Structure formats: structure tokens, C-alpha cells
């Protein structure tokens, strides 16, 4: 009986050990996942280690890199510090005076330039008026009008003409004629006898007679009116006389 109980306990212990091993084996995770992860990690570590081992830095590499980096960094820091100081720090006691003097000089230069531009670039209309006034102030100017040239009456005597246009339109006549103003030339009617006209009032009141009509002059003024001829309308001479009297 005693031996039987001992065998039973021994068999139970063996069973428990086998069961624990089976359970542990079945509950363990898939080994392929762990293996792949470990392999990737090992590959990365190997690459990094190989690159470091193949290209070791020289003895002066760190010094050169440090010097260039420090120079660039110092330059950037200096620029930043200068701009920061100029922007944030208040100006010194003498800065206000120097700045004020500089601004005053710039303003004076701008005002001087504006004054010169205003003086040199006067309006064209003002220049034209000044030129016109200067010409009028020089003295009287004799101007030959178009009415005088159009109504010029030729004569046989010499006539004094002051302008080039009058010389071009001059037609000699038989007797001398005195011409003083444009009004006299417009109202002047030549005749066989010389006549003198002194003033505008006398010219306005002057009425020529039929015998004093100069047919050449009237034909020049009124080319559509002709003397009585074989092919003209009766009464045109009377109409011409009436116009002369008017």
C-alpha cells in the first residue's frame, strides 16, 4: 500500500512537468516575427557601424569644420546683434543732433531743387503772354491786313509800300494815290482826277457819282456784274451805278 501511494505521487509529478512544458511551448509567440525584427535592427546597426568604420574623421577635420562654422555663426550673430541694437537701443546723446542736421540738409536740398524747377518750368501760356507784352512794348508795329491787300486799287503813279505782301500785290497805275489806313483803302474809289481823303468821317460821307465810277475796280470786286454788252442783261449798268452810289 505504501509503495502504491509513492508511485502515484511520482506519476502525478511527471504529468505536471510534461503539462507545463506543453503549455509553455503552445503559448510562445511566433518566432518568425521576432527574428525578422531582430534581423532588421542588426542590419541597420551594421550599416551604421560600417560607415563609421570606413570613413573615420581625420585629425584636423573637426577643427576646420568648427572654424568655418564658427566664422559663419559669428557673422550672423554680429548682423543680428547690430540690427537688434539699432532697432531696440535708444540713440546716444549725440545721435539726435547728427540726425537733425542730416535731415535739415536733405530738406534744404529738396526745397532748392523744387525752387529751381518752379523757376525754370514756367507755364507756356505765361511765357507767351510775356513775349507778347515785350513785343508790344518795343513800339508801334505796322501790320498789313488782308482787307487792305484784297481791296487794293491800282493807279499809274508810284506808291510807297512797307510790307513784302504789298509789294507782291502791287499793280502800277497812271496817277499817284495816297493810302493811309485800311478804312480809306476800302472806301477809296479812283477817278480821272486825284482826290484826297483826310478822315474817317469824310470817307463815310463821301458818295461818288455815276461819272466817278471806276468800272475796272467794280469788276474786280464784283466779277459777276458786267457792263452792258451784246450778250449781257439790260439794266446791269444801272445796277452797277446804284451799287456805286450806295
Swiss-Prot record:
Q: Which GO terms describe its biological process?
A: nodulation
Q: Which UniProt keywords apply?
A: Nitrogen fixation, Nodulation, Signal
GO cellular component annotations, sorted alphabetically? peribacteroid fluid
State whether keyword Signal applies.
yes
Q: What start and end residues bound the annotated signal peptide? A: 1-24
Q: Where in the cell is it found?
A: Symbiosome, Peribacteroid space
Q: What does this protein do?
A: Involved in the development and function of nodules. It might participate in the biological process of symbiotic nitrogen fixation.
Q: What else is known?
A: The sequence shown is that of cv. Nagyszenasi.
What's the name of the protein? Nodulin-25
The organism of origin for this protein:
Medicago sativa (Alfalfa)
